Amino acid sequence: MSNIYKDLEAQTQRSLQNFAIASDQMPAELIHALARIKQAAAITNARLGVLDQERCEQIVAAAIAVAEGQHDAQFPLRVWQTGSGTQTNMNLNEVISNLASQAAGEPLGSHHPVHPNDHVNCSQSTNDAFPAAIHVAAVEGITRRLLPELECLQDAFAAKATAWETIVKIGRTHLQDAVPLTLGQEASAWRAKSTRFRNLK
């Protein structure tokens, strides 16, 4: 697919010009989560009769493609923008609109048959959609990345508890020497603490 933002859409272009601060881009995980919000909104709007089925399917197809990371290059905006994330929300609305236009054989930027505001952003406020996307991205990050790493950490502590069971060290309490213990016991305590991450599930 060609680069949709060779000629940037209006809202995205304005944001790049108004917030030309550093180079920290919006995390792709957040973009993907926001695309899921757009997908869910389109389905709900269609069920309520607010959006016709054809446009719903076009938005859903484009949103899924974005959520799967197929169009990450189309999101050049920085994290430095207004606090509500309005610019990123509009960036995504414009990308989904253009993807739908392209799929329908219409020129990019035509906003036909899917308009960024009237259809992609239908029944949404950035003040709701963006925080919801943050929560979705956080849950996915915890589930897919953090929890598996914590499982590995717990296993590593268990292995060290066994490997270090004969190494005696002095305990420390309030920066003073305390009761001796083995390094294995200390590693075992770390392992016990690490099991608490299961509450995140």
Enumerate the language-model features and the residues they cover:
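Conserved, well-structured ligand/cofactor-binding cores
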Residues: 1-201
